[in-house]
Regions:
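A cytosolic small-molecule/anion-sensing beta-strand core signal
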Residues: 52-53, 68-69, 87
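Histidine-centered metal-chelating micro-motifs
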Residues: 37-38, 57, 73, 77-82
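Short acidic-glycine-tyrosine-enriched beta hairpin
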Residues: 62-77
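Short strand-coil-strand connectors
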Residues: 23, 59-63, 86
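Short, surface-exposed secondary-structure edge patches
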Residues: 39, 48, 63-65
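Ligand-binding loop in jelly-roll beta-barrel domains
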Residues: 77-101
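Short, conserved beta-strand element in jelly-roll/cupin
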Residues: 31-33, 43-58
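A short glycine-rich, His/Asp/Glu-containing loop-to-beta-strand
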Residues: 5-36, 94
Length: 103
């Protein structure tokens, strides 16, 4: 498999993900346009997010923080979170179990 051959899917306005699913996890490389909003939500999946480039304001359980390159955020199952990209961003997300709705 070559990441360059995976066509990105627009999951939300401004969120373009190259998505790979394993048996028990999902891996997503996001390209996010400046000003794109991630509405507050929660899901059963555990999530680990790594910011490769750009800057976003991310809120987890009501606590907002500015995240830039090198930031890692661990999001436990069923925890409310949201965000907005302050610049164009590239982010790597890993989810377990699989994000079935992204298939």
């Amino acid at each position: 498999m070559n990441l360059n051959n995976i066509k990105p899917k627009e999951i939300l306005p401004g969120f373009y993900g190259k998505i790979i699913h394993g048996e028990k996890m999902s891996w997503i490389l996001w390209d996010i346009k400046k000003g794109s909003k991630l509405p507050e939500h929660r899901h059963v999946n555990e999530q680990i997010m790594y910011v490769i480039e750009g800057e976003l304001e991310f809120t987890l359980n009501g606590k907002a923080s500015i995240c830039g390159p090198g930031s890692v955020i661990v999001i436990p199952s069923n925890q409310a979170h949201s965000g907005i990209s302050r610049t164009s961003c590239q982010i790597l997300d890993v989810f377990s179990p699989v994000r079935e709705e992204y298939k």
